[in-house]
Amino acid sequence: MTELFADDSRSNRERMLAGDPYVADAALAQLSQQALSRTYEYERAYLEDPASARRILENLIGELGTGVDIRPPLRVDYGSNISIGEGTFINFNLTALDVAPIKIGADCQIGPNVQLLTPTHPLDPEERRSKIESAQPITLGDNVWLGGGVVILPGVSIGHNSVIGAGAVVTRDIPAGVVAAGNPARVIKQLA
């Protein structure tokens, strides 16, 4: 493992943020643990103290637009690599593994049990055993609607005003102004 990074003076976090192979070391584990703790604080505050809940989100999420509503529970790897545009609504149980940036546009609607998954692992079993991973960003344009249970895989972009049907697994980019559904998701309708 150390041989792979022998000529690279960057930290694992720096390699991770650059989209290069890295190992989730103790420093990254600590950041992830802090994010997990904040998500639990957010859950407790959501009903009892909305102003406090908003402050917790502002400290957890990298960029948070006005009027964003996220129903708990919320699960993130770090939170700091997520940006959410104004007026976006996120229903219960979002999992956003933000090893790479996750950009959610303005006025999006995200159904329950959605997964935004940026990490990827080597296909080669020996490389995978060494715990090396990398990630690719996910981008959702403005006014995107993700139905319940949608899974978005690493490197995917979804264009403005598109709808992804419930239960879809999105493995490649989806253009603007369409409805896509299925596993793997494919465009089934052009919107006017």
Segment roles from a protein language model:
Residues 159-162, 175-177:
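Conserved catalytic segment of ABC-fold P-loop ATPases
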Residues 145, 163, 179-181:
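Short-chain dehydrogenase/reductase
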Residues 41-43, 172-177:
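Short arginine-rich
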Residues 47, 74-84, 89-157, 183-192:
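Flexible, glycine/small-residue-enriched loop-and-beta-strand segment within the central core
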Residues 157, 171-172:
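Active-site/ligand-binding-proximal alpha/beta "capping" segment
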Residues 1-67, 185-189:
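Terminal amphipathic alpha-helical/low-complexity segments used for targeting or macromolecular assembly
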